[in-house]
């Protein structure tokens, strides 16, 4: 399962690279990637815990983007 979470985290990273790191909601990200919502949420948690992802509350959803080094 850890490997699967890691691959999904890579898919999320690639998604942001391909979309110029434009902020996206969790709902849109889950709809865009061919992964289960649970796996997407676990991968987002991994990236956020590692300090690679910035999450902000957006109504009933969350908006996120990659943290880029300054």
Give names to the regions the model predicted:
Residues 2-9, 57-70:
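Short, cationic-aromatic polyanion-contact patches
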Residues 24, 38, 55-56:
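A local structural micro-motif
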């Amino acid at each position: 399962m850890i490997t699967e979470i890691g691959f999904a985290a890579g898919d999320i990273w690639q998604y942001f690279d391909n979309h110029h790191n434009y902020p996206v909601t969790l709902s849109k990200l889950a709809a865009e990637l061919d992964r289960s919502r649970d796996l997407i949420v676990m991968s987002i948690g991994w990236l956020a815990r590692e300090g690679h992802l910035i999450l902000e509350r957006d109504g009933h959803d969350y908006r996120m983007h990659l943290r880029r080094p300054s």
